[in-house]
Amino acid sequence: MRIILLGPPGAGKGTQSARIVEQFGIPQLSTGDMLRAAVAARTPVGLQAKSIMESGGLVPDEVVVGIVADRIDEADARKGFILDGFPRTVAQAKALDAMLAAKGLSLDAVIEFRVDEEALLGRIAKRAAETLARGEAVRKDDTPEVFKTRLDAYRSQTAPVSDYYAQTGLLRPIDGMAPIDDVSRAVEVLLRGLQPVSA
């Protein structure tokens, strides 16, 4: 089972990803973790990424796709994987599809957690107010202003990926505003429907 999780910051991708890992025994692949691991392992692609990152550049799509390609060849990913945080652009989505096709693989589903952005902003503002009321400092990335910037970036850069996968027939929208357990149940039903029935 090879799946991608999409959704804006605060949509619950991390929570749902952890539950999928637990229920289905497939690894969550984070591009950030994979980049760091490839650099630490001094793989050819990792060394290429390291020199780019050290010079302050953005790691090009082909390098990131190369790192994903290496990672999905590992034993724990043979039954499948969850990609979270990648692809972020349509170009990356197309590169991922081409890489998987070259390996004789394809994605099974792209789950998009749909949320009400105003409600998300309200949650963040409430959390910030509660943190301040406890006399604690609000993390810089947890303020409504920063969160709105992250939402805007998601909308402009990553939201088109949703349209791309809708055109391929892989997109499976789920209501990310429902209670966490309801979202988990919806994800589980969807994923169980993807599993082949044993004879």
UniProtKB/Swiss-Prot annotation:
Leader peptide range in chain numbering: none
Biological or metabolic pathway of the protein: Purine metabolism; AMP biosynthesis via salvage pathway; AMP from ADP: step 1/1
Major enzyme class: transferase
Amino acids binding AMP: 31, 36, 57-59, 85-88, 92, 139, 150
One biological process term in Gene Ontology: AMP salvage
Catalyzed reactions per annotation: AMP + ATP = 2 ADP
Family annotation (InterPro entries): Adenyl_kin_sub, Adenylat/UMP-CMP_kin, Adenylat_kinase_CS, P-loop_NTPase
The protein's Enzyme Commission number: 2.7.4.3
The organism's place on the tree of life at top rank: Bacteria
Sequence positions that bind ATP: 10-15, 127, 178
Residues covered by region (LID): 126-142
UniProt GO cellular component terms: cytoplasm
Subcellular location(s) of the protein: Cytoplasm
NCBIfam families: adk, PRK00279.1-3, PRK14527.1, PRK14528.1, PRK14531.1, PRK14532.1
Family named by the database record: Belongs to the adenylate kinase family.
Descriptive protein name: Adenylate kinase
